């Protein structure tokens, strides 16, 4: 076989950061559950299943962990603009969506009931098959994922 001069050039790549929080998840879960019925006004761009998560020291600590981990990986500083609680009841899922106005998004798993759905990410590298490069991750208590706001994602049943 003739030796060829070929070089691999990466044009696009999507990184996902996985970290683990050290906060008291029981205390945070109580705050989230206590605010479950306190829903955002749909007129400001939230969905009906998103609950208000009032400012608290547990979320503040997670935000600092995420900012620290993101900086360690990218040498970029980020600041949160909003956060909320998203509690799935049995057999609930989340439709495919993204957070296109956000540079970075994150999800934190506070509690994982048996039978919880997986989070799936759908990079749009194939114009004919949206799931061609999909990746699926089982939820883990205390784990967070940091990802680009434009990255489509969903939660299975």
Predicted regions and their residues:
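Catalytic core of non-heme Fe(II) oxygenases with the double-stranded beta-helix
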Residues: 79-146, 150, 154-156
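Non-heme Fe(II)/2-oxoglutarate
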Residues: 1-76, 93
